[in-house]
């Protein structure tokens, strides 16, 4: 499955992009005046191949898994919180769940590695094992387990497509996963540890220093093939990270627009884009996470955050907010009149076609 997906991803429909841009530029407004909404609508057309789109059926896919490195004291919350919050996703009481309900977004929650035998009703069970190994002592998982996690993410998108979802978000739950994400990002781009290690869900200074030391050491000790994203996941990642990477790959393969949440989500988008550089064409951002590594990862991906709301929750919480903005972009494209449709003579625009006619540079 994985090789088929990696080889089968095709780029945007450039002919439709040209047509969509011409339509947007002909709408009864100053050129470019709806800013990012215009860019979103045009790229959405390039993804779907349709001029007019709607995202009336929306879903955030959440991957839940435990991380062995938690035993090193890199997180303030106990490991049991992974299971408890996964249950709360289903109850609709978490941050992402309440935001999702506010604009008609569904959640699809997967157990890919929670450290528990409990089967949670409403959660799709794809458990690879009960948590990963402790990356401070040994690789997180085998290479085959890493591939399996990717394929679970791809399968999740297939399920979402069959259910008729038109846009996806990517979220997670897993105590210790800002540590694994920081290690993955460091391995991906070769940056300083201090640039990628933040305080996650909250830790004291002693734990923060320990977290930085662990990330520094694990990237050196496991003989990582830095040119192989799957090997990076297997050595210092997590099942949640692998499955989320698979969601981004699957979204590109099945041509479904997909929204990046915060730090962990953007790291997995970057992993997917390293596996196939066309992936980012299908990705929309949401918010600028306050977790320190986010800015480096989004810059490496070549995208800009849509919003800055001082958020740092994770879970996929930024995705429903971005869905609303994307809804506005589709409303513009679908319902706004062109100059011709509005019986407006736009000949006056001939002298003000350049950006400098609208913005003081």
UniProtKB/Swiss-Prot annotation:
Its EC number is 2.4.2.21. It is an enzyme of class 2 (transferase). InterPro entries: Nict_dMeBzImd_PRibTrfase, Nict_dMeBzImd_PRibTrfase_bact, Nict_dMeBzImd_PRibTrfase_N, Nict_dMeBzImd_PRibTrfase_sf. It catalyses: 5,6-dimethylbenzimidazole + nicotinate beta-D-ribonucleotide = alpha-ribazole 5'-phosphate + nicotinate + H(+). SUPFAM superfamilies: Nicotinate mononucleotide:5,6-dimethylbenzimidazole phosphoribosyltransferase (CobT). Keywords: Cobalamin biosynthesis, Glycosyltransferase, Transferase. The active site is at residue 315. Catalyzes the synthesis of alpha-ribazole-5'-phosphate from nicotinate mononucleotide (NAMN) and 5,6-dimethylbenzimidazole (DMB). PANTHER family: NICOTINATE-NUCLEOTIDE--DIMETHYLBENZIMIDAZOLE PHOSPHORIBOSYLTRANSFERASE. This is Nicotinate-nucleotide--dimethylbenzimidazole phosphoribosyltransferase. It comes from Clostridium perfringens (strain 13 / Type A). The lineage of its organism: Bacteria, Bacillati, Bacillota, Clostridia, Eubacteriales.
